[in-house]
Amino acid sequence: MSSRRRTTVAFVAAALSALVALTSTVAAQSPNRELIDGLEYQLLYAALPLTLFVLMILIYAAVKFHDNDDPQPTTEDPALEITWTAATAIILLFVGLSGYSVLVNPYISPSQAIDTDDRSQEGFDSFQDLPDTGDEEVHVRGYQWEWQATYPDANVTTENQIVIPAGEDVTFWLTSDDVIHSLFIPDLGVKQDAFPGDYTRARTVVDEPGRYDVVCAEFCGAGHSRMQGEIVVVDAETYDQWLSENEGTVAEAPNPD
């Protein structure tokens, strides 16, 4: 086997290995992450063959016509023009429908509460006016530069820790005390902005107990990089017991193990 052929084979093998690594992921821990990952792979599988097809045409044209000393204008070909126009329309339709099917999912775009100007600067009193979602609810307030969570059923508060039960639908109601913050949980595929004076909603369900990093994804001042926290997911029994034991207090999150 020639040196050039060995190089080509090695390059193809490396490319295939990279593709396998790219498309191999651990099981998603929430429907949010599962939906987002699924959309990304759908678009990847559609884009990859198209990219290779275009590259093959470019390589073919470069090799075939690189020494053409008498180039001629391209002749009109209505059938070819109709074909690539129709193909482009089909691809765009596929992308649009794939994206829309994810965006309308209730975990990705839950119904939002209407904006209100009646916000208490002293605590979470104004959260009480928000509609009942039927989920386990956590009220989250962002401020420079921490997250504070309150659990209305037991009036428990945590700092930079948000405790939720595993296997149950959870709604986070978010607001901000000062500037725009953004609650971002990468492992769960949850991201929602928190605005001063307004209330926004994020929704998820987490399958397994554990700890998941939380960061602020909106530049919010000099301490932005320090605005970190965690989602602590525990089983439902531990969650209920933790709420009852810490009612009316500022508490530490229970151990998910």
Model-derived segments and spans:
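Flexible loop/N-cap segments at domain edges
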Residues: 176
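Extracytoplasmic beta-sandwich strand-turn segments characteristic of Greek-key/jelly-roll folds
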Residues: 30-38, 68-84, 162, 185-208, ...
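N-terminal edge beta-strand
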Residues: 133-167
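Extracytoplasmic/periplasmic beta-strand context in beta-sandwich domains
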Residues: 138, 181, 227-230
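Extracytoplasmic entry segments of secretory-pathway proteins
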Residues: 2-147, 254-257
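Extracellular/periplasmic metallocenter environments
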Residues: 92-97, 192-257
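Short beta-strands and strand-coil junctions in structured, solvent-facing domains, enriched
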Residues: 146-148, 180-181, 190-191, 239
